[in-house]
Amino acid sequence: MKDIIFDTFQNDVSTSLIRHKSILDVLTKYTESCSKVNRSVAKAVTNCGCIDITASKQEFNNTDTSLDELSKAFSTHLNGKLCDNCREVIENEIGTSLFYLVSLCNILYINLYDVLINETSKLDTLGKFTFR
């Protein structure tokens, strides 16, 4: 069922992309949309204040720390929770970014669902050893 959702979305994007068919247009629109995601997160911090970032060096002291403990030792540096308005803006920007990512996949004849399956397989095989 999930593959149908991805395939439907990919087909819908293919039929709705009219103005920006060039690979160069799609690459630059995708980059721009990713920048807008970043900008909308920054605006949630600087304009709204619903979230804030308190960054510091990520430290852990024990060299014998397990991967589970290591994962818990690191912080996102994010405090607070997105308000409804900021969440909506960020979700819209992520949606636009997904649109152009799928457009790129379409131009390159790459099935997004297959990419997700491959990444899931890597995670299942390597687990925490993927170190991303």
Placement of each model-derived feature along the sequence:
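Flexible "arm" and connector segments at domain edges
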Residues: M1-I94, L98-R132
